[in-house]
Swiss-Prot record:
Membrane spanning stretches: none
Gene3D superfamilies: 6.10.140.2100, 6.10.140.2110
Reaction equations catalysed: Fe(III)-heme b-[protein] + nitric oxide + H2O = Fe(II)-heme b-[protein] + nitrite + 2 H(+); H2O2 + AH2 = A + 2 H2O
GO biological process: one example: removal of superoxide radicals
E.C. code: 1.7.-.-, 1.11.1.-
Residue ranges of domain Globin in the record: 2-148
Binding site for nitrite: H65
Native source species: Orcinus orca (Killer whale)
Matches recorded under Pfam families: Globin
Quaternary context: Monomeric.
The protein's name: Myoglobin
Residues where heme b binds: H94
Amino acid sequence: MGLSDGEWQLVLNVWGKVEADLAGHGQDILIRLFKGHPETLEKFDKFKHLKTEADMKASEDLKKHGNTVLTALGAILKKKGHHDAELKPLAQSHATKHKIPIKYLEFISEAIIHVLHSRHPAEFGADAQGAMNKALELFRKDIAAKYKELGFHG
């Protein structure tokens, strides 16, 4: 299920656009996640009080967390599938501390694709979307394997 060099290039090209505004992209992605799947908000004690999109847009904490999420994802994507060292601590915290189900990672992947397409339609056409979907699927498959090693079947 690996990506070709060309597919990785498509992923990293659009990621360059994301890195120009990690916090803004991250905030948009989290808002899309929470609006589309409100149950995911329950995993975030510090965001549970954010009930409206306006509240979410005004939250500096949400923006900071969006930056954190996309910084970690960017480090993983740049490894082009050789991301074991980056994945291990992420899987550890998400499985044992936060207890984030794999399904929620599917939800955020959908939000990532949507936000990147809406913000960068010229750079994120069908080929780039397909490549990013494959990269995110690889990430989810590998993190699910780490979850299993940790005894978490979320």
